[in-house]
Amino acid sequence: MGSYDRLTSLDASFLHLESIETPMHVGAVSIFEGEQFFDETGRFRLAEVRRLVSSRLHLIPRFRRRLMPVPLNQGRPIWVDDPRFDIAYHVRLTALPTPGNREQLMTLTSRIQSQLLDRSRPLWELWFVESLEEGRVALIQKTHHALVDGVSGVDVATVLLDFEPTPTYLQPPRWIIQPPPAQWRLLADSVWERATEPTEIIRTARAAVRGPQRALDETVRMIS
């Protein structure tokens, strides 16, 4: 196998079930006191927030990876490093009419969450919202189920941000982009995986003691 990881049957099912009417990402909204987010001139510290998030991306490697399909759809997609990863695309800033109230924030959140994530990029977005009443700042999180389940439901904001008055910028290791596998290798690996799926089915069934319903669902998907 190559140096990549493949979606599980469950994670891949989120992609298959997704449609414009049924988005398969999860969302959250948080509201914070705004003082720490603004500089002495009153401007939002967007560049600093992006730098802070960038310094922590190595803690969740998949947040710099995109989906890559298997040729001829002969298997589940894999995660590969995104060579055009752009932190500015994933960490954004918007604003409400001053002073924004909760109803306006929920309307904005609904609009953002109604849009599907771009599958050609890593499947997450963080939207900061300024101009809330009392000078507060909101954070709208948007992360695909296939990605969240793959990192065991990690609280993205807790890992990527630091809400202390003086945030800590980590010193991450240099990110070395790994090239995607050759198409022929990816196809060959998928064929081999399909040939060994009966073993995977047995393994999934044994896991039913820990999670009966989820294990059953995975087994059914692999058989069908």
Locate each region found by the language model.
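Soluble acyl-CoA-dependent acyltransferase catalytic core bearing the H(X)4D motif
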Residues: 1-12, 29-42, 50-224
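Acidic, low-complexity proline/glycine-rich segments
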Residues: 9-21
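A general structural signal for short secondary-structure junctions and capping/turn motifs
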Residues: 20-22, 116-117
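Short, flexible turn/loop "capping" segments at secondary-structure junctions
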Residues: 21-25, 133
